[in-house]
Regions:
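Extended catalytic cores of very large enzyme megasubunits
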Residues: 1-273
């Protein structure tokens, strides 16, 4: 007999966020099936000699007496096997290296929340943007995967730091609405990534001859989060850590910021002291 969650709201959250679609049955999982998928996955990763009370754990989760990592509950199985970052609820990175941006993209695409620091002691370690940015014949070809998106963004930013404005080819990215069979949900299509390329180019163009400001770093990360759609359902979760005397970040959400900088809605901002 299937275990029912106590309320309609809990049913909705389970079905919309955690229940995977079962192709064989032509429907989404029941609560029991979601828990069984989770237990089965971690059982397969555990030494048989270890006496883990799997039946007790299953019963406790079914009855909401304990709860595992909700990211794992969503992804346990092929999705978690492929991208193990998807098992973590949250992560942290300091923006002290140009690779931080594409790493954040990958982590967010796995559904994991990101805390990031734009404290000046970190952002000052970034290189200067060249005074001369010129169009090049280089084309960044985007592969249709999380790693593909992140790798293409790393290449695009690296080329900007070398003074080259690359073209991009998103022809391999599946169209919007197509099913994501491994991770679940629907594809967002290539348009959001193209939007990110244009946004990043605009910021780098304004920053020619100097380093990116803390606010510019913050905005790039927020824009990355804005274009990431995890499993067609889960949006990005961010917290931005700043210097306590950073007036630009302090006023980042003052006035009608949402009119021209709507990406800033994606992150909470907290001062470090």
């Amino acid at each position: 007999m299937s275990t029912r969650l106590p309320s309609i709201y809990q049913d909705f959250i389970h079905i919309s966020r955690y229940a995977r679609f079962n192709d064989d049955l032509g429907r989404r999982e029941t609560w029991d099936e979601t828990v069984d998928r989770y237990i089965s996955y971690f059982k397969s990763k555990t030494d048989n000699n270890k006496k883990v009370p799997w039946d007790e754990l299953r019963t406790a989760i079914l009855n909401l007496e304990v709860m595992p990592s909700m990211r794992c509950l969503m992804t346990a199985g092929p999705a978690l096997e492929k991208d193990q970052v998807a098992g973590y609820n949250c992560s942290y990175v300091a923006i002290d290296n140009v690779k931080a941006f594409d790493e954040i993209m990958y982590v967010l695409m796995c559904g994991t929340g990101v805390g990031f620091s734009v404290e000046s002691k970190y952002t000052n370690k970034l290189p200067e943007v060249p005074e001369d940015l010129h169009e090049s014949d280089t084309t960044v070809v985007v592969a249709d995967s999380k790693i593909g998106w992140a790798s293409s963004y790393r290449e695009f930013i690296s080329l900007l730091y070398s003074g080259k404005i690359a073209k991009w080819d998103v022809s391999k990215v599946r169209p919007s609405g197509e099913r994501l069979k491994t991770f679940g949900g629907r594809a967002s299509g290539p348009e959001p990534l193209v939007d990110l390329f244009k946004f990043t180019l605009n910021i780098f163009t304004k920053a020619r001859g100097r380093k990116l400001s803390t606010l510019e770093c913050h905005d790039i990360v927020c824009k990355i989060a804005d274009i990431v759609v995890c499993g067609g359902v889960r949006r990005s979760a961010l917290i931005s850590l700043t210097d306590i005397n950073d007036d630009q970040l302090r006023h980042a959400k003052s006035g009608d910021w949402w009119t021209h900088n709507g990406q800033r809605a994606l992150a909470n901002i907290s001062a470090v002291y």
